[in-house]
UniProtKB/Swiss-Prot annotation:
Keyword NAD: no
Family according to the record: Belongs to the universal ribosomal protein uS5 family.
PROSITE patterns xrefs: RIBOSOMAL_S5 (PS00585), S5_DSRBD (PS50881)
UniProt entry keywords in alphabetical sequence: Ribonucleoprotein, Ribosomal protein, RNA-binding, rRNA-binding
Keyword 4Fe-4S: no
Protein name as catalogued: Small ribosomal subunit protein uS5
Domain called S5 DRBM: residue spans: 11-74
Alphabetical list of HAMAP family matching this protein: Ribosomal_uS5_B (MF_01307_B)
GO MF annotation list: rRNA binding; structural constituent of ribosome
Subunit-structure text: Part of the 30S ribosomal subunit. Contacts proteins S4 and S8.
Length: 166
């Protein structure tokens, strides 16, 4: 039991959207709730999950559990991303550009939640195409997954980090 309590404190969670969905049956409509939640430790790990249940708190709980099972590690350089990247999912795309210290997180709604919980403090971003919250979150995560730091690029090219910058 103590381990689960530690795990809960480790991650911060943010509810992005809660949506009421209806199933039409012979007797009328049956309502359920879907929740989209982003979790992160503000130290380079972030994930998202969706949950569906008859009550809102239960849907959020399911979404948090799903999010913790699907975490991504985000490379960061001085509170921002190592380079410019565009994340895509469906018809939605998110353009992210590193920013100077003190700029802050310039992003809208779902994208902001993901970036802040990933521990990124300075970044410029623009959402393009579909603005559905789930697509925006997935596009942001896609972009963050495709980030590479200088050490990784140097290793791929068989060079040292110093050779890359000269």
């Amino acid at each position: 039991m103590a381990r689960r309590e530690e795990e809960t404190k480790e991650f911060e969670e943010r509810v992005v959207t809660i949506n009421r969905v209806a199933k039409v049956v012979k007797g009328g409509r049956r309502f359920r709730f879907t929740a989209l939640v982003v979790v992160g430790d503000k130290n380079g790990r972030v994930g998202f999950g969706t949950g569906k249940a008859q009550e809102v708190p239960e849907a959020i709980k399911k979404a948090v559990e799903a999010a913790k099972k699907d975490l991504v590690v985000v490379p960061r350089v001085e509170g921002t991303t190592p380079h410019t990247i565009t994340g895509r999912y469906g018809s939605g795309s998110v353009f992210m550009k590193p920013a100077a210290p003190g700029t802050g997180v310039i992003a809208g709604g779902p994208v902001r939640a993901v970036l802040e919980l990933a521990g990124i403090t300075d970044i410029l971003s623009k959402s393009l195409g579909s603005n559905t919250p789930i697509n925006m979150v997935r596009a942001t995560i896609d972009g963050l997954q495709n980030l590479k730091n200088a050490e990784d690029v140097a290793k791929l090219r068989g060079k040292t980090v110093e050779e890359l910058y000269n």
